[in-house]
């Protein structure tokens, strides 16, 4: 009787590289395969051109060497959602495992887009093709005679997020990275509380769960709260400003929809500008997830971004820009506007709205400090933290625990303090560290004491 957990990436760090593998007897299933958002900035536009070895060296992708002896035993890989810290390394790593890869439609379409870019730069001698399979929430897939996958819908800050469940002869293994409980989400899925409670009654062997915000003694607010914040701030800014620029996560389709809808009500034409805005926005439009107002434009190539901003600069009060660069990352649209590299001139009459939070890593904090300082020097009006998180707070985590009643818990997707904070919560709920709650770090494995 063997159930082993391999902590491949995301264990002991908050910024990405999320990748976990579970071995059940002689069969292995991989969960997620993400990149480090800040470490990948080292390569800027050349991420696709960089070799796996280079990316591992700077810790931009998971070091999956712990799985090398087990590649032939890998029977499936599952992608929980489409954030880059969960799918960004798929083109670099998963082709080596020669196994089917499952995800929801939005997730799979984004992986396909990344694969198309990867193929352009791949070594001709290397076969990087991956067998991708689209699933719907509630689907079940029998992957081997012993193992079955189930996909439970859950809310998060990106459409079409699921909690993958691996059903084994020893009980269910639930992978809850990432989630929040939001009953008012409009785009994407709502949590299936009924199925989660039912699963708890059937028997959950192991819960692998994110821990990013478990130290915060809150229930994470609904995205409906962010919609009201966006509406309130943009109406205020519209009265006081000529130009309005909003920067947010390109993958946060529901937030982009809310910003665009408010701009439309204010009589401002919408421009989405930036490479990742184009990637996520176009796929979301194709799948019917994003419905931009009439006349809205997406500019994602250097020449179209330049032309679009030039036009908006001449009639600032008629436009609202939704742009990349909320982390201050070099090469994104907002930092380039601030540095005068793009033809949109900021003045004291303009407003910049950050519908985002700063991802807690040293590089991001430094980049944001530089960006904020430059904006202040230009006299621009700034509105920060017009945002709610997509990650579970302490009380969301407590609810998940009480619904699932897992026998064992492994906190993931967090730095050491976050993992410890989850262990503290679990202790409150009657669990004990090193008996049924296990803190793991990258490159380690755990055999469950069955």
What is each residue range found by the language model?
Residues 385-392:
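Short beta->alpha junction loops
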Residues 93-97, 200-202, 342-349, 402-404, ...:
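Short, conserved loop/helix-junction motifs that constitute active-site signature segments
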Residues 15-18, 141, 438-450:
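Binuclear metal-dependent phosphoesterase catalytic core
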Residues 2-76, 85-265, 269-275, 279-304:
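His/Asp/Glu-rich metal-coordinating catalytic cores
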Residues 218-355, 360, 365, 369-371, ...:
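Hard-cation-handling environments
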Residues 204-205, 397-414:
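Proline-aspartate-enriched helix->loop->beta-strand connector
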Residues 117-121, 372-381:
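Short helix-loop-beta junction
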